Amino acid sequence: RDSMQGLGMMQIQSLTLSNDDDQFKLVRWDNVGEITRITNPITVDHTLLRQYLLPGLLRLLSSNRHHDLPQSVYELGTVVRDHKNASRLAFLVAERIGGFAAIRGRIQAFLRDLGASEYEIQTLPDNEGPWLAGRAAKVIVNGKHIGCFGEIDPFVGELFELKVPMNG
């Protein structure tokens, strides 16, 4: 939390309930393991327990698109994969300037704050997830893939009614 706040981000807490479109289709991610579905959902927007945090951040920025930029938010929250809870961190920055160099700098500062002195940043294949082709990477610490980051593809942003450059 201290690191994220030090990077100028505001903590949010989004709903753990989500839906297939937000979690998978709109952000171009595959489901990981078994999906925990709600037996009798009250709305079509809340049919499963989330596997990813980023779609909730995109929904939040979509709801706040009338506010001035930059908007920088993060969530340290729970996701459910294979019917098991797991803690995850995600952040999203909407800003007119920035791009891949800015997000990489934030990731490196975060890793430094965590004390990770040795890590690798490897380019992700094009069209993997919500990322803009050629502008995304994964982070490897001690041989383990711990996350990915990049610029959000403008096409994905438009699906959430966001027309501003974003990275996360």
Regions found by a protein language model. Give the residues of each.
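Extended beta-strand-rich architecture
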Residues: 1-168
